[in-house]
Regions:
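Residue-level recognition of tetratricopeptide repeat
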Residues: 32, 65, 103-104, 137
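Structural marker of alpha-solenoid helical repeat scaffolds
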Residues: 19, 52-53, 85, 89, ...
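Alpha-helical adaptor scaffolds
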Residues: 80-113, 120
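Structural motif corresponding to the intra-repeat A-B loop/turn of tetratricopeptide repeats
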Residues: 3, 37, 70-72, 108-109, ...
Length: 154
């Protein structure tokens, strides 16, 4: 997304946050946009609050990704929390969480094989363009891992 669109998104999510401060998705999306705009400290503060107060693992996942990108070892803690919660949610409600869990394992969770399994499950549940795009990204991530393994054995 270009900077102008990110600025507009930040304004919109901040307005939503001010109107309904307890609405976690507005806070989470605002943090995501802030991180993209380089407002890392604000994004981290917002996500830390959400990650400890919400049972939605997306916030811990976003927090882990931003901390990892910043080179902070705390990312492991948040990544572990998100991983455990996604595993629980996929076990009990696969149709609702397979896509989000696959996104996590492609990103902060760094397990493309698990992402591929979940992306395949997601395509079986919902045959949408978004589901197929997620599957394609998971396949590509596994091909990259496979190529690295092959190269290391040369």
């Amino acid at each position: 997304m270009n900077k102008g669109r990110l600025d507009n998104a930040r304004i919109s999510f901040d307005a939503a946050r001010r109107r309904v401060p307890a609405y976690a998705p507005a806070q989470g999306h605002l943090a995501e946009v802030e991180a993209e705009l380089g407002q890392t400290e604000s994004a981290l503060a917002r996500l830390r609050l959400l990650a400890v107060s919400s049972d939605d693992p997306d916030y811990a996942s976003q927090l882990a990704r931003i901390l990892r990108d910043a080179g902070c070892s705390q990312f492991r803690h948040w990544c572990g929390l998100a991983a455990a919660r996604y595993d629980d949610l996929v076990a009990s409600h696969p149709e609702a969480f397979a896509d989000h869990a696959a996104e996590f394992w492609l990103g902060a969770g760094a397990n493309p094989d698990k992402a591929l399994q979940l992306a395949r499950m997601n395509v079986e549940i919902r045959k949408t363009s978004r589901a197929y795009d997620l599957l394609a990204r998971a396949v590509a991530a596994n091909e990259v891992v496979g190529a690295k393994v092959m190269k290391s054995h040369e």
